[in-house]
């Protein structure tokens, strides 16, 4: 059950960082898929322009695995559209993330909308879409 999945404080912080980067990029109309790698001592944000979702995921896999054991966590973020139960489309930032040493990764989301030319994030009681297998080598 999605409601039973638990996200660590570290992954929650990484999700918030990824969403903040999505908001900045979308507000400047320069949104491209990107990868956040948590590597000591700080982190790295890599833009991942790609022709398809498959190409994006393949490139992210390469970069995550190339980082080896130094990669503590990662987040792959992109702009997409989800649908409410009614079928109504709603724009959302999608973030797949995982932390080394944890059995589960997650695909999470944050809805947004444009109001009077400003991007506003819409709060939702559950941000988790599904469990995901971590992409570590």
Question: For each of these PLM feature ranges, what is it?
Answer:
Residues 1-63:
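N-terminal domain-onset segments
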Residues 73-137:
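Low-complexity intrinsically disordered segments
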Residues 54-84:
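A charged amphipathic helix-loop-strand protein-protein interaction module that recurs
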């Amino acid at each position: 059950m999605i409601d039973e999945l638990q996200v660590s404080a570290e992954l929650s912080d990484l999700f918030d960082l990824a969403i903040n980067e999505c908001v900045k990029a979308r507000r400047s109309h320069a949104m491209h898929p990107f990868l956040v790698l948590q590597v000591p001592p700080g982190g790295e944000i890599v833009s991942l322009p790609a022709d398809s979702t498959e190409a994006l995921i393949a490139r992210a896999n390469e970069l995550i695995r190339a980082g080896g054991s130094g990669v503590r966590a990662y987040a792959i973020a992109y702009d997409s559209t989800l649908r409410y139960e009614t079928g109504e489309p709603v724009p959302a930032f999608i973030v797949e993330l995982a932390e080394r040493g944890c059995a589960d990764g997650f695909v999470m989301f944050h809805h947004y909308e444009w109001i009077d030319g400003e991007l506003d994030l819409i709060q939702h009681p559950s941000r988790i879409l599904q469990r995901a297998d971590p992409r570590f080598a």
